[in-house]
């Protein structure tokens, strides 16, 4: 099965989506931490919302980058499911790296427990899967390929 919609540029392959969306989520997180403090962010579970949005942004960005690589002939994929698995694999990689970074930067903090790490990872993965589902099922004629 060949990739069907490679010739049509999907919305997630635009530079503002690829670059600005992940940076925007990161900046929103930092602004909220600055304004309300890390204790308030964790007690009100706002960090889970931010991790979910981060999962959406990483999923869209990695899909956009992979689409550009395919359209230039750098990467050749014959199946759109392989495309989806690559995007999901990159999402998993980023989620794990982000939690390692949080551990390194904030280790002595009382808020970064094992349960918090797992909930952050789950929220990031759910956000990414939600983005894939929305693009595949809800937005007509828009695929991750």
Predicted regions mapped to residue ranges:
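Bulky hydrophobic segments
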Residues: 1-118, 122-145
């Amino acid at each position: 099965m060949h990739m069907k919609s490679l010739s049509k540029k999907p919305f997630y392959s635009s530079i503002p989506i690829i670059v600005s969306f992940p940076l925007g989520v990161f900046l929103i997180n930092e602004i909220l931490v600055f304004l309300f403090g890390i204790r308030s962010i964790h007690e009100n579970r706002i960090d889970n919302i931010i991790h979910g949005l981060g999962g959406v942004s990483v999923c869209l960005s990695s899909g956009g980058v992979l689409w550009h690589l395919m359209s230039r002939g750098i990467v050749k994929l014959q199946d759109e499911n392989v495309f989806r698995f690559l995007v999901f694999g990159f999402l998993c990689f980023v989620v794990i790296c982000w939690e390692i970074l949080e551990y390194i930067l904030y280790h002595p903090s009382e808020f970064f427990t094992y349960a918090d790490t797992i909930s952050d990872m789950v929220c990031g993965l759910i956000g990414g899967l939600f983005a894939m589902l929305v693009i595949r099922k809800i937005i007509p004629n828009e695929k991750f390929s």
